[in-house]
């Protein structure tokens, strides 16, 4: 790495962007790789995961992946699919996704028309093909109306799992546990 590359002048230190992979059941760290802080999240994620997939496939162990929108890339989806890995990866909200979820948004609006204070939620799914994808994939979504707010919040997840949309959202939300460990690593 070049001397000035990845240097954060605000913190007066070099930034690093590690890959960390945790076991979803035990919380154990499976693999880590320190990377330059100037790299995008998804850059090389497919290759990082491939060796893990191979090791687990040889042992006959089923693999699952949850990832935030920073890891959303066709290369990673394809690596998961070709290695038998079930995945749930968040997509960044965009107008095309919102338009495809508009029927359920209308249902949520109708359901809360007489009570716009309480919390409300709806789930759905559709097939979607982004411009960089070779073929359509299943996208599940959640639309929430938070308590005391009139606006809606969206969650879009691309997946190859066969579960109900709400179950996939629950599975995806389990990714928060490793983030507590990552925070701990950063503060040590």
Predicted regions: what is each one?
Residues 57, 77-86:
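Short, surface-exposed basic-aromatic patches at helix termini and helix-loop junctions that form
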Residues 1-20:
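Active-site-proximal, Lys/Arg-enriched surface segment
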Residues 33-55:
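Active-site beta-loop-alpha junctions of metal-dependent nucleic acid enzymes
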Residues 86-187:
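An anionic, glycine-rich sequence signature occurring as long contiguous blocks
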Residues 24-36:
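Gly-rich Lys/Arg/Thr-decorated short loops/hinges at beta-loop-alpha junctions or inter-strand turns
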Residues 35-37, 68-70, 92-94:
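Active-site beta-loop-alpha junctions enriched in small/polar residues
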Residues 1, 27, 64-72, 87, ...:
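Short, conserved catalytic/metal-binding motifs centered on acidic residues
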Residues 73-78, 98-102:
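A short acidic (Asp/Glu
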């Amino acid at each position: 790495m070049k001397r000035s590359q990845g240097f954060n002048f605000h913190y007066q230190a070099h930034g690093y962007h590690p890959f960390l992979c945790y076991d979803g059941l035990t919380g154990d760290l499976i693999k880590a790789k320190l990377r330059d802080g100037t790299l995008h999240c998804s850059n090389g994620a497919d290759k990082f995961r491939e060796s893990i997939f191979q090791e687990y496939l040889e042992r006959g162990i089923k693999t699952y992946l949850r990832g935030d929108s920073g890891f959303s890339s066709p290369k990673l989806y394809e690596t998961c699919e070709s290695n038998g890995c079930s995945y749930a990866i968040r997509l960044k909200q965009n107008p095309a996704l919102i338009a495809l979820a508009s029927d359920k948004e209308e249902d949520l609006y109708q359901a809360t028309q007489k009570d716009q204070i309480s919390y409300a939620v709806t789930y759905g799914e559709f097939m979607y093909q982004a411009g960089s994808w070779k073929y359509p994939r299943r996208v599940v979504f959640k639309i929430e109306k938070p308590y005391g707010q009139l606006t809606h919040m969206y969650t879009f997840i691309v997946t190859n799992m066969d579960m109900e949309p709400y179950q996939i959202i629950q599975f995806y939300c389990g990714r928060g546990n490793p983030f507590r460990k990552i925070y701990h690593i950063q503060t040590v």
